[in-house]
């Protein structure tokens, strides 16, 4: 099944009004903090347990269901609750069950043929049949409901990117296929936020999917009216007859990992243009890119290498990933985590090729390096909170530097693949916020509300500016590059790995500019300027993807 555009669709167009879910459920960890119906934050004293209002409490009958049996693993309780809601809240069409349920593909035959999950589906179906007091002779319908959820449900994120739970939408959305280079994305709004509240001036709403109505035979909004609403938005220009696509997974992965992810979650292999490209697309080549350096040009302290390049790269990847996992599991402290990861990023690993010693380092855009930057920015920020007063500023500074470098890397990837806009927006926003927090630590008497101006970017925020996104981003990045000329060496001081890069948007390993002495006031002003440009660029990308803007950038008088 697929959905195609009936006519040309411009970039930054919402493809249809918000869709209500057929069924949804919070993850267990958010049941006590968010409304189980609309996913909004609960008030301090909610009128009803687990719900923000009496109206929301009437929409959900199964939150207090019996204890889930352990046999349902790896199926999550949220999957079971969503399946229960699906069977309870809709007039279920069983005519093509178990292969389809309410026009949704279930993948029942594939999932039940997989011994790693079929037993869990069977136990979960029996559990659901008991809860709803089914008197049917078999649990085929319950199995179909679970399979429909596993195949079609999407993870619901709040405005900060936090995964709150899952939701299942009708075929108006579920028939939109996956691509690793999609032309659209989707976002969520809750019932407390009207569609017009999140609709910005430059956003259009399309009714250009008549083909969708003809194929689906369903209303665009045939959900139950409750739960997080979904909006699909174009992030590229879409030609008439072109298929509408979104991404089901994290796109900042090389082809092999994406294929594995899609198969484990959705039981299909992607054959989109990016996956089928031979040779691999540029973004996939650098997501697995390594640099081979002559041994004499490297420093001491390498890890034991091997005689096989792929094996050596695998060792680097595994070592960094193990350090990240140990840090996230609290098995190592932030300081140890930083030392372990940075030693591999900076020194690389030795290996022999044709009896000659060489050194391998991960490309700055390598997917493992991206995860490392995220972890290092977090670890250094924690160290800034836990450290003695004398090094708080240093830890905050390096945390901001890693976040800014990650933003620069994401821009490089975004230039090659426009569907990376979602990730890039998040990274630039995080960098801007960390730099914004850093500024007052550099000079306490200088207010962050100081008059920070950039005349070059002054017109980018005006409502009558219709310049192309490429032109706007080019101007912002030009300013970032200029400001970094005098700020990058200060931000990266004491961090050997980042010190070797020319700037956060230039990954050349040769530094041409020596560190320039600046007063604390100059440093603070430049950090604020850098922060404002990061937030401005994040707003540009967020508007592209979601039609929304942050309020942080308004603090600066650009």
From Swiss-Prot:
UniProt cross-references to InterPro entries, sorted A to Z: SET_dom, SET_dom_sf
UniProt keyword Methyltransferase, yes or no: yes
Residue intervals passing through the bilayer: none
Domain of life: Eukaryota
Keyword flag Methyltransferase: yes
Domain SET, first and last residues per copy: 115-249
GO molecular function ontology, one term from the record: methyltransferase activity
EC number(s) stated in the UniProt entry for this protein: 2.1.1.-
GO biological process: methylation
Keywords: Methyltransferase, S-adenosyl-L-methionine, Transferase
EC category name: transferase
UniProt cross-references to PANTHER family, sorted A to Z: PROTEIN SET DOMAIN GROUP 41
Family indicated by similarity: Belongs to the class V-like SAM-binding methyltransferase superfamily.
Name this protein carries in UniProt: Protein SET DOMAIN GROUP 41
Species this protein is from: Arabidopsis thaliana
Organism classification: Eukaryota, Viridiplantae, Streptophyta, Embryophyta, Tracheophyta
Name of the gene: SDG41
